[in-house]
C-alpha cells in the first residue's frame, strides 16, 4: 500500500482550454487521457508472447480478481513499470475536487501513490502551452513537499 501524496494543480489561462482540462479530470482515467499507456493486452513481451487474461470469481459468481499472465505464468507487470517511469506514480489519481475559481483559473486536487505525477503534468504543459500551471504536492509519510 502506498503513501498517499496530495497534489494541487492550478491552471491559469483561456477559459475554453481550462474547460478541456476540467473534462479530462472528470473522467475515470485522466492520466491515461493526458499521457496514454500502451495497450499491454496487444503488446508482445520480449519473447513475443501476448498476456492471457486470468480471472477468479467469488462463490456468487461475481468477479473477485483479474490479471494478465504470460504463458510461462509470469504476471504481466509492464503497466506498473511504465507508469512509474512515465507518470512518476503507480496508477490513476484519486480526484478529490475540481474547482473553477474564476473564469481564468481552475484548481484540481487529487491523491497519487507515493509521489507527484510530474510526467503527466509535463505532458499536460506540452498539450496546453498557452496555459500556466502551478503544482504543489505534499507526501506526509516521508515528509516531502514542494512545487514543480
Segments and roles (model prediction):
Residues 1-148:
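Long, contiguous binding/interaction regions
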Amino acid at each position: 500500500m502506498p503513501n498517499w501524496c496530495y497534489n494541487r494543480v492550478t491552471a491559469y489561462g483561456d477559459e475554453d482550454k481550462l474547460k478541456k482540462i476540467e473534462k479530462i479530470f472528470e473522467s475515470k482515467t485522466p492520466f491515461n487521457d493526458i499521457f496514454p499507456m500502451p495497450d499491454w493486452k496487444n503488446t508482445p513481451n520480449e519473447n513475443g508472447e501476448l498476456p492471457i487474461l486470468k480471472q477468479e470469481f467469488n462463490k456468487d459468481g461475481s468477479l473477485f480478481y483479474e490479471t494478465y499472465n504470460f504463458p510461462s505464468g509470469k504476471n504481466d507487470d509492464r503497466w506498473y513499470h511504465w507508469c512509474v517511469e512515465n507518470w512518476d506514480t503507480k496508477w490513476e489519481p484519486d480526484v478529490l475536487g475540481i474547482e473553477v475559481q474564476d473564469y481564468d483559473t481552475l484548481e484540481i486536487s487529487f491523491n497519487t501513490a507515493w509521489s507527484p505525477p510530474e510526467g503527466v503534468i509535463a505532458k499536460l504543459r506540452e498539450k496546453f502551452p498557452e496555459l500556466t500551471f502551478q503544482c504543489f504536492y505534499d507526501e506526509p509519510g516521508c515528509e516531502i513537499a514542494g512545487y514543480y
